[in-house]
Amino acid sequence: MPSSNGPRQATRNKLKNDARERGTSPPQRSIEEYDDGEKVHLKLDPSVPNGQFHPRFNGRTGTVVGEQGDAFKVEIEDGNVTKTVIAAPAHLRRQQA
């Protein structure tokens, strides 16, 4: 059988919650606010399908550069290229100082 070339290929572990994290996510995570210039970690939450970014960028750290609707624009470095990822607040974690 030919292999899949879809955007969710090779994401069996990236899009799977651990046993203790199953069920609905904490609602506080979905209404979190971030300021411009703040460092955030990109972490996909599989139980929230809306506002997911491409799984290729899972685990990256970037800087919030603005808002787009309810989501945030995050700039990340991909090699020598700066890319902008749009992600809902449920998929972002604030970097600890």
Curated annotation (Swiss-Prot):
Q: Which SUPFAM superfamilies match?
A: Translation proteins SH3-like domain
Pfam families reported in the protein's UniProt record: Ribosomal_L21e (PF01157)
Which keywords appear in this protein's UniProt record, sorted alphabetically? Ribonucleoprotein, Ribosomal protein
Comp. bias (Polar residues): 1-12
Q: Which GO terms describe its biological process?
A: translation
Supply one GO CC term from the record: ribosome
Where is region (Disordered) located?
A: 1-35
Recorded GO MF terms: structural constituent of ribosome
Q: Which domain of life does the UniProt lineage start with? A: Archaea
Q: Which InterPro entries match?
A: Ribosomal_eL21, Ribosomal_eL21_arc, Ribosomal_eL21_CS, Ribosomal_eL21_sf, Translation_prot_SH3-like_sf
Q: Which family does it belong to?
A: Belongs to the eukaryotic ribosomal protein eL21 family.
- Recorded protein name is Large ribosomal subunit protein eL21
UniProt organism field: Natronomonas pharaonis (strain ATCC 35678 / DSM 2160 / CIP 103997 / JCM 8858 / NBRC 14720 / NCIMB 2260 / Gabara) (Halobacterium pharaonis)
